[in-house]
Amino acid sequence: MQNNHYHIIVPIKDSLETAERTLRALQGERVIIWNDNSTSENTQRLHELAAELQYECIDVAKLTDHPSPNYLLLLHMMRERAIQENAHLIIVESDVVVGDATISRLLREAEEDNVGMVAAVTEDDMGTINFPYEYARRYERGRIATRKRLSFCCTLMTLQLLKRVDFNQLDPDKQWFDVTISKLSRESGLTNLLLTDCPVRHYPHSSRPWKQLKYTHPLRYYWQKLFYDRDKI
């Protein structure tokens, strides 16, 4: 029987144009907005959207003075909440637009035995698989069991994974944890699935424009990465 208990969390730091598109595409779902130190003006707008769409909005600035990104806090808080409520946890990034059937498909695949993570492949507006799943361009369309990392662009972590994997193993000096959790899921005996026939639209790094330098000016990107201690995965 399908587990109908789940939470969708959308981490947002400013970039309201793409974030609003993400939130509206999820209308009717159980969504938690993770407002990770957006400006006061954008925070107000996020609360307006939350009220309109009947979402919950968590202001991270009220929980910690740690600078964005606060993914580790998100993962610890939401894991505890999901376990208490016997729920799966779905992360949808604020630069992703889901389709009408995306969430139901993730949930359906999550009911297979020994599944840890289920991710929707990402595409651009032309229908070409894009970052971070370029490696999947050679795959057939369908349900792919993979040992490669799954991004948090649009990914479900099953209740089974949340119970089995202790997030206290995560390195607090890092900022992003999709690589680590993908590995821990496999090491715990679970299978990670990539759905190459269930694409979502992805507009990479809309909330962190400096990361576009990785493709346009790689030297500047790596200088900022090292000098400002950014983008640690």
Regions found by a protein language model. Name each.
Residues 171-233:
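C-terminal catalytic/acceptor-binding lobe
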Residues 34-46:
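A conserved acidic beta->alpha catalytic loop
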Residues 71-76, 96, 103, 150-152, ...:
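Conserved glycosyltransferase catalytic-site signature
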Residues 86-97:
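Short beta-strand-to-loop acidic/aromatic patch adjacent to the donor-nucleotide binding site
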Residues 99, 105-168:
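Conserved catalytic core of nucleotide-sugar-dependent glycosyltransferases
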